[in-house]
A protein has these predicted regions:
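Acidic/His- and Gly-rich active-site-bordering loop/insert found
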Residues: 1-97, 106-129
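Membrane-interface loop-to-helix entry segments
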Residues: 99-101
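Acidic/histidine-rich catalytic neighborhood of metal-dependent amide-processing enzymes
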Residues: 103-158
Length: 158
């Protein structure tokens, strides 16, 4: 199997874009749009609106008959005022990606892009289904986003 080529420049740009416009739990509309648009462009079957702002991209590998694998990233920010002075500092008052979910989402997008490219070139072994899962509202507590996403993903994609 070939090694994936990660688009590090795009990953950096996605992270900075998300960092500048952080969204709290169940408000991840801008992030959802970026993720779903990108996954669609890379050939994923995209499901949006799961647990309000969750996104899942489905990639069929080979015949699709085989194991199912899910990879998950969180998307939400925290209600914190950013004062880092960085060029990509939050532009939204009282909201910040202090938890690193902008990085988590950008890394997962980079992996999704690389895996789709490898799949299109016939470089992924075997047969099965890959689900790339972008979960909203991880920071809300009590498992709100995770539990809602789990119910929706399992019922929608099984």
């Amino acid at each position: 199997m070939a090694h994936p080529e990660l688009d590090l420049q795009s990953m950096k740009e996605w992270r900075h874009a998300m960092h500048q416009f952080p969204e709290l739990g169940f408000e991840e509309e801008r992030t959802c749009a970026l993720v779903s648009r990108s996954l669609t462009e890379w050939g994923y079957d995209v499901h949006t609106g799961l647990a309000d702002t969750g996104v899942v991209g489905k990639l069929v590998i080979g015949t699709g008959k085989g194991p199912k694998l899910g990879l998950r990233a969180e998307m939400d920010a925290l209600p914190i005022q950013e004062a880092t002075g960085l060029p990509w500092q939050s532009r939204v008052s009282g909201k910040m990606h202090a938890c690193g979910h902008d990085g988590h989402t950008a890394i997962m997008m980079g992996a999704a892009k690389a895996l789709a490219k490898m799949n299109a070139a016939g470089q992924l072994p075997g047969n099965g289904i890959l689900h790339i899962i972008f979960q909203p509202a991880e920071e809300i507590g009590g498992g709100g986003g995770a539990q809602r996403m789990k119910r929706k993903v399992c019922s929608t994609l099984s």
